[in-house]
Every structure is written in C-alpha cells, then in structure tokens.
UniProtKB/Swiss-Prot annotation:
Protein's recorded name: Large ribosomal subunit protein bL27
Family indicated by similarity: Belongs to the bacterial ribosomal protein bL27 family.
Keyword tags: Ribonucleoprotein, Ribosomal protein
Gene Ontology molecular function, alphabetical: structural constituent of ribosome
One record GO biological process: translation
Taxonomic source organism: Corynebacterium diphtheriae (strain ATCC 700971 / NCTC 13129 / Biotype gravis)
Database matches in InterPro entries: Ribosomal_bL27, Ribosomal_bL27_CS
Classification of source organism: Bacteria, Bacillati, Actinomycetota, Actinomycetes, Mycobacteriales
Region feature Disordered, mapped onto this chain: 1-25
PROSITE patterns reported for this sequence: RIBOSOMAL_L27 (PS00831)
Length: 88
C-alpha cells in the first residue's frame, strides 16, 4: 500500500444537494386542492381533515380552504378548514 497520497487525490469534495424540505404553506393561508403543504422525511406533521399524505410523507390539500396547524395527542396535525360560502 502507498504511504503517500497520489497527486491531486482527495477524500473530500462531496456533498448532497439540499432537499428543500419544510412547511410550504403556513397557518391561515388559503390553498387550492392539490397544493403541497409540507415536504418532510417521516411524519413530523400528520394529515388531518382534508389533507392527504403522499408516498414520501408529503402532505397535500384534498380540498380548497385555509391551512390550520393543531396539536392533538402530542401529534402535530395539519387541517384544511373549508371556506363557508354565504348565500346572499
């Protein structure tokens, strides 16, 4: 085995790209059906009312409405509160 590194070899110089995870729509924001609410690894946030969960644990809106974050039984839930339409 060589006891000295060869010319210009290095064990450094590698890094993975950032995955752009996190909350994408915050509490009180209006969203449409299908909009991504949270990108995550694992279920840091759990789906609540009108929220679906993708195969990579991404949470998305199933219906249009306002985003709401609540804590229930030590779980952080994301709900979509549908907008009530007022008949005039």
């Amino acid at each position: 085995m060589a006891h000295k590194k060869g010319a210009s070899s290095s064990s450094n110089g590698r890094d993975s790209e950032a995955k752009r995870l996190g909350v994408k729509r915050f509490g009180g924001q209006q969203v449409n059906a299908g909009e991504i609410l949270v990108r995550q690894r694992g279920t840091k946030f759990h789906p609540g009312e009108n929220v679906g969960r993708g195969g990579d644990d991404t949470l998305f809106a199933l219906k249009a409405g306002a985003v709401e974050f609540i804590t229930k039984r030590n779980r952080r839930l994301v709900n979509i509160v549908e907008n009530e339409t007022v008949d005039a």
